């Protein structure tokens, strides 16, 4: 009888430790961003698709939040924030080269160790751990001059394109 009790107890411990979940509150400061009319989302990696969880800002303070139940075993998995409803991931934050990104996983963020309910506060496109945002660099006026005196083609205009204008 003692062995049966111990076996049942061991199975209960194994099952409950195997299925540990926690509520993780994600707070995302969007003060430096023009928020898309499509919404702000959390997705990627262990979270799911690009529109898996919509964040909301009911008090209008610029901090968008969502509570997500996550398996504790997903610690170290990836996630990302998106400014807009873009199934092709085109509106995800750009963390390339920042210390909070995982270059082996599309430069997504890395979940910290999850041992219980917790809060993650950060800034869109930055590695803040307290929810604060660094001021964006000041805008600069740039003048491009193109010498077209040697051009013999038929186009009548010069266009400049790049990542700065959505190219």
Regions found by a protein language model. Give the residues of each.
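Compositionally biased low-complexity segments at domain edges in trafficked proteins
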Residues: 112-143
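Aromatic-rich carbohydrate-binding modules that target alpha-glucans
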Residues: 32-74, 84-112, 148-167
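A short, amphipathic beta-strand motif
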Residues: 22-30, 142-147
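Exposed beta-strand face motif in extracellular beta-rich ectodomains
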Residues: 75-79
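Compositionally biased regions
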Residues: 8, 18, 23, 91, ...
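Bacterial Sec-dependent N-terminal signal peptides
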Residues: 1-25, 135-139
């Amino acid at each position: 009888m003692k062995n049966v009790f111990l076996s049942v107890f061991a199975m209960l411990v194994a099952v409950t430790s195997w299925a540990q979940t926690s509520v993780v509150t994600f707070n995302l400061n969007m003060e430096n961003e023009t928020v898309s009319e499509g919404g702000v989302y959390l997705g990627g990696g262990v979270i799911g698709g690009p529109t898996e969880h919509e964040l909301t800002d009911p008090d209008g303070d610029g901090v968008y939040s969502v509570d997500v139940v996550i398996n504790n075993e997903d610690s170290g998995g990836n996630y990302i924030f998106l400014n807009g409803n873009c199934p092709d991931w085109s509106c995800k934050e750009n963390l390339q080269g920042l210390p909070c990104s995982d270059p082996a996983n599309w430069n997504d963020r890395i979940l910290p160790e999850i041992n219980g309910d917790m809060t993650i506060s950060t800034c869109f496109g930055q590695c803040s751990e307290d929810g604060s945002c660094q001021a964006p660099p000041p805008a600069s006026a740039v003048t491009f001059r193109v010498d077209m005196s040697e051009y013999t083609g038929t186009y009548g205009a010069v266009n400049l394109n790049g990542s700065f204008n959505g190219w």
